[in-house]
Amino acid sequence: MMRLSVQDGYFIHPVSGKADVSIEGVITDSGTLSRNYYGSNNKLECWSLDSQYPHPDVPDASQQSVRCIDCPQNVRQSGYKPCKFFTTINVVPDKTNMVCEIRIGGASLFAKAVNKMSLFKYIDYLKRNGESIDTVLTEIYLVHEAVPKMYFKPSRPLAEDEMQTVTRLVE
């Protein structure tokens, strides 16, 4: 699967290399809330794919705690938590026939901005309006703040043929 990366505040298209501050696409999988902790040498030491318990592959010497909620790296230190939330979503960019991964950091999952929606706020918004995330063309855009964030907003509902195309691509 192709990875749609973010570099210097721009999405980088995985094929063309074109940089853009926003993309439109269909989110086909909203991901699983996960966590990771990078130690003092910036090496990944501990991680969780369910945000509850360290992954079984984490070496005992690197494991920070038996449960994520009890972990000392889950305590706010100087304005941030060393153990970071993230998720990886799957997106079919508009006018393409490919599925891409986008990694979304905690600031873009839980942001409390006015008139902007983090991923979780966006999913709740769609549910309240009788839609699901995979039936709407979504604009994902970057905002350059002290901590850069991704925000989400609906562009339009998908037509039936578009939904069928997306379903074929993800199967």
What are these language model-derived features?
Residues 1-98, 147-149, 155:
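OB-fold ssDNA-binding interfaces and closely related basic DNA-contact patches used
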Residues 82-160:
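Extended serine/threonine-enriched, polar tracts that run as long, contiguous segments within proteins
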Residues 156-171:
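Short peripheral tails and domain-boundary helices/loops at the edges of structured domains
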